[in-house]
Amino acid sequence: KTSTTGYVQRQLIKAMEDLKVSYDYSVRDSGGNIVQFIYGDDAMDATFVESQPLLIIKLSIDDITEKMYFSADTKWNKLIKVNSASRMLKDTKYQDKIDENFKKILNHREYLISVIFNKDPQNNINYPVHIQRIIENNITKKNTKSDINPIEILKLNSKLIKKCFILEKFKNNKIFEILVDIHLNPKLLIQKYNISKEEYTIITDKIYKKFNESKISPGEMVGVLAAQSI
């Protein structure tokens, strides 16, 4: 049996040794034939992949609400500075936007459980950009109120997600979007960390940089590794 599997693996290595990542992130053989349209379906370098927490999978809806939802009766003056609160309250639909974001979090939870984990929910997921670590390494515990409000955070989160993609024609960054929405949740950032606008900017800049650093390099020979992983 060992000799058979060894033979099969050698055959696979021989057949796949010329596979490499092209500049459009497709995997092609030496003849230019496409084997995979996007390397690994996300174009991320496996050497950067690591386990990171999801926070919401095994929590009840009530617990998620407590951690991640600002209700309509939130006392904003206790959490964010007056100017920041004033900017938000000028938007008559600010609560609708908060509600919509929370529904999105719950939809993410359902997607992870049913699609990603196939009804066997896990607390962690493998992905290159460890957002929680970036947050904790670039934020300081303090007693001052935040000078950035939830609506500003949601708007900037959306901008971050939109600019982190592989190709203009391939913007499948669903897992990244979920991780951003979870870890950069306004209530977590404001209530737990009292985040400042400066800290938020530093964090999102580093997330953007890490996302781009984690992409597979065009020209990388990936066939042998893939063959040995089967």
Regions found by a protein language model. Give the residues of each.
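Core, soluble structural subunits of large cytosolic macromolecular machines
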Residues: 1-230
